Amino acid sequence: MKLLITGFDPFGGEKTNPAIEAVKRLPAAIAGATVVPLEIPTVFGTCAEVVRQAIITERPDVVLSVGQAGGRSALTPERIAINLDDGRIPDNAGFQPVDQPIQPNGPAAYFTQLPVKAMAQAIRQAGLPSHVSTTAGTYVCNHIMYQVQHLRATEFPQLQAGFIHIPFLPEQVVQRSGVPSLSLTDDVRGLTAAIRAIVIAHAD
């Protein structure tokens, strides 16, 4: 079994993004499955093409995308992606769509194929906060989740895909009083637990 794990580059003026930093530190194999890390740009459209090319090259069984959700206090596997781009800030290419469909002829939403409740439980069993989320937002995180699901629907039917949000790192909240954070070590531990849950479910 092979998993493609994607993480976004820094955006919104941040110097770091816990998503790619955690993804880069994942073990090469988890529960006997191969883990392939991939950095993707925080850019509408382009991020999906980068992932598509990686799917063609790597032929993964699962794509799990990881993104930063500043303000959240837990690792949150996402249940659903909606067909809407509505950027609160411009992406890293300066593009800021407002109320635009991601795929004009696509469905209103896609549900993940990943075992989100088992993932959240595994993260909690690792001693970290986690719960299933029903909103991936309307920025590039939701965009990539939707786009990978659309790729599954149109090109790669055997693929399973999903998304998980992780909190800010401690160094990102130094000037943000009261905003929660999680250490990079804990991010890696939580993601590893979530991936193990995916592998176990895939084997059943």
Swiss-Prot record:
PROSITE patterns, per database record: PYRASE_CYS, PYRASE_GLU
EC assignment: 3.4.19.3
GO CC annotations, alphabetized: cytosol
A GO molecular function held by the record: pyroglutamyl-peptidase activity
Family annotation (InterPro entries): Peptidase_C15, Peptidase_C15-like, Peptidase_C15-like_sf, PGP-I_bact-type, PGPEP1_Cys_AS, PGPEP1_Glu_AS
Keyword field contains Transport: no
Active site: E78, C141, H165
Record keywords, A-Z: Cytoplasm, Hydrolase, Protease, Thiol protease
EC primary class: hydrolase
Subcellular localization(s) per the UniProt record: Cytoplasm
Xref: SUPFAM superfamilies: Pyrrolidone carboxyl peptidase (pyroglutamate aminopeptidase)
Catalytic function, reaction form: Release of an N-terminal pyroglutamyl group from a polypeptide, the second amino acid generally not being Pro
GO biological process: proteolysis
Protein family membership: Belongs to the peptidase C15 family.
HAMAP family: Pyrrolid_peptidase
PANTHER family, per database record: PROTEASE FAMILY C15 PYROGLUTAMYL-PEPTIDASE I-RELATED, PYROGLUTAMYL-PEPTIDASE I
Classification via NCBIfam families: PRK13197.1, pyro_pdase
Assembly and binders: Homotetramer.
Role played: Removes 5-oxoproline from various penultimate amino acid residues except L-proline.
Name of the protein this chain belongs to: Pyrrolidone-carboxylate peptidase
Gene name of this polypeptide: pcp
